[in-house]
């Protein structure tokens, strides 16, 4: 039976390994903030379980359609009633902007309407890979 001490020790070991990897990446000049490559198939599954209540790839719903979102200026898809903040934004959807948006939409475009976030970096990377695949990228 696993004890609390064993679990805590395992967690410390994982954290230590993560710090070692991050330190090595910095020493080699690799930015730690670089997004990991996502899994588009897992992203599709996540999209269908988390995003589909408000979004669709092909049609506007509560939120805008996502077909072609990657590489597009925020607030520019036809037929959707974006908030004034999103319409006025200069944001173009790419890896970094989508990652920040999914983590905390309000921090990217204050005054936007989306009230949902994706806290896990791996989930965001997978969703971005899926959205990218649906944009011909």
Locate each region found by the language model:
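Bacterial N-terminal signal peptides that target proteins for export
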Residues: 3-20
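Short Fe-S-cluster ligation motifs
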Residues: 79-99
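Solvent-exposed, acidic/flexible segments
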Residues: 40, 44, 59, 91, ...
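N-terminal signal peptide c-region/cleavage motif recognized by signal peptidases
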Residues: 29-32
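C-terminal capping alpha-helices of c-type cytochrome domains
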Residues: 94-137
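Cleavable N-terminal signal peptides
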Residues: 23-24, 34-35
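Short glycine/threonine-rich turn/loop motifs
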Residues: 40, 64-84
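Sequence/structural segment immediately N-terminal to covalent heme-attachment motifs in c-type
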Residues: 38-61, 66
């Amino acid at each position: 039976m696993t004890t609390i001490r064993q679990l805590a020790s395992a967690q410390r070991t994982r954290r230590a390994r993560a710090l070692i990897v991050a330190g090595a990446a910095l020493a080699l000049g690799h930015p730690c903030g670089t997004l990991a490559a996502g899994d588009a198939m897992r992203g599709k599954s996540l999209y269908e379980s988390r995003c589909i209540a408000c979004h669709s790839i092909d049609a506007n719903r509560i939120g805008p359609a996502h077909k072609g979102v990657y590489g597009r200026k925020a607030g520019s898809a036809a037929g959707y009633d974006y908030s004034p903040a999103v319409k006025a934004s200069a944001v173009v959807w790419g890896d970094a902007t989508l990652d920040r948006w999914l983590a905390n939409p309000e921090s990217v475009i204050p005054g936007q309407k989306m009230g949902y976030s994706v806290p896990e970096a791996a989930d965001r990377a997978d969703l971005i890979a899926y959205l990218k695949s649906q944009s011909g990228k």
